[in-house]
């Protein structure tokens, strides 16, 4: 599926603030949550609905709800946690499945070190969240893991994506829809997105940077 770049004015504005070199941990963390929520709105626009009856103030009324099992949100640790609160603000009943993936800084390849999936995940929509889609190795490894667990409907939400990472995911998993706030220019020789956001994990958790 072609990657969907969500160019909503609010997303563009907030992402611009996130690109500042001197942004504080507090502001970066809050903006990651806000953009995560806005991406969630777009990524769930086609969810199926079903009708049911309730007793309203003036009698029985027919209303709608999302059909099927609850969604599971899958943050890729550790940086994916930074988007989790924003996603859950819109889908508070979602289950959370955590996947830990580490990238070798020399080979840029990923390996999985943690897997905590919710029950009946094969019947749920799995929404992967990670601020950065750089080489794509972490995302591909996570999708591999979810498909092995039986997931059939998988979507990915990232704040910023590199063309190289998009190509890697689309080649390995062409059935997975990617939603991103921005498709950036390229990767540098160290596997970082240009212009990107810097190290999103460090900025979310306040490591290796000065707090304002």
From Swiss-Prot:
UniProt cofactor note: Binds 1 Mg(2+) ion per subunit. The magnesium is bound as Mg-PRPP.
GO BP terms: UMP salvage; uracil salvage
Binding annotation for uracil: 193, 198-200
Chemical reaction(s) catalysed: UMP + diphosphate = 5-phospho-alpha-D-ribose 1-diphosphate + uracil
Pathway: Pyrimidine metabolism; UMP biosynthesis via salvage pathway; UMP from uracil: step 1/1
Keywords, sorted A to Z: Allosteric enzyme, Glycosyltransferase, GTP-binding, Magnesium, Nucleotide-binding, Transferase
Binding site residues for 5-phospho-alpha-D-ribose 1-diphosphate: 78, 103, 130-138, 199
EC number(s) reported in the record: 2.4.2.9
Signal peptide coordinates: none
Activity regulation description: Allosterically activated by GTP.
GO-annotated molecular function: GTP binding; magnesium ion binding; uracil phosphoribosyltransferase activity
One Pfam family in the UniProt entry: UPRTase
Taxonomic superkingdom: Bacteria
The UniProt record lists the keyword Zinc-finger: no
Gene3D superfamilies hit by this protein: 3.40.50.2020
Cofactor dependency: Mg(2+)
NCBIfam families in UniProt: PRK00129.1 (NF001097), upp (TIGR01091)
HAMAP family: Upp_B
Protein family per UniProt: Belongs to the UPRTase family.
Task performed by this protein: Catalyzes the conversion of uracil and 5-phospho-alpha-D-ribose 1-diphosphate (PRPP) to UMP and diphosphate.
Name of protein: Uracil phosphoribosyltransferase
Species of origin: Pseudomonas fluorescens (strain SBW25)
